[in-house]
């Protein structure tokens, strides 16, 4: 077997293995409308819609992109390009006080859903 051929195959396998390990490198843009809004509708609007308890207590409505970006009566919960500075991400990822983990009193979001929110914020929190 030719040494150059063997080295080429080994190099290709190493590159493919590294690429396969990078599960967080999306091949498409993560947007609010396509990726985040379905999560919000399924897990957040039960409490964070007009007249609901979460919205009343925090002032945080989540019924539109604009409302999500506006934040609570205490200030923004999303800092575009910085999930680690964004309360929304910290709350759903379990990185904040457990007594205020979101969704409150419900099952946690899946790892995939949390990753989608983190990537969306880290890529600028764009609408579409």
Question: Positions of the model-derived regions?
Answer:
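Bacterial N-terminal signal peptides that target proteins for export
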Residues: 1-9
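Bacterial N-terminal signal peptides
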Residues: 8-17
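Aromatic- and Gly/Pro-enriched helix-to-coil junctions and flexible linker segments
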Residues: 19-128
């Amino acid at each position: 077997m030719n040494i150059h051929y063997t080295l080429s195959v080994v190099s290709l396998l190493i590159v493919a293995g590294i690429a396969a390990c990078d599960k967080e490198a999306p091949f498409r843009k993560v947007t609010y409308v396509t990726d985040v809004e379905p999560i919000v509708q399924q897990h957040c609007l039960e409490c964070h819609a007009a007249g609901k308890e979460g919205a009343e207590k925090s002032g945080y409505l989540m019924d539109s992109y604009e409302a999500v970006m506006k934040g609570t009566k205490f200030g923004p919960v999303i800092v575009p390009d910085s999930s680690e500075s964004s309360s929304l991400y910290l709350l759903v990822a379990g990185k904040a006080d457990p007594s205020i983990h979101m969704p409150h009193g419900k099952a946690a979001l899946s790892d995939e859903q949390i990753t989608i929110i983190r990537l969306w914020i880290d890529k600028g929190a764009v609408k579409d």
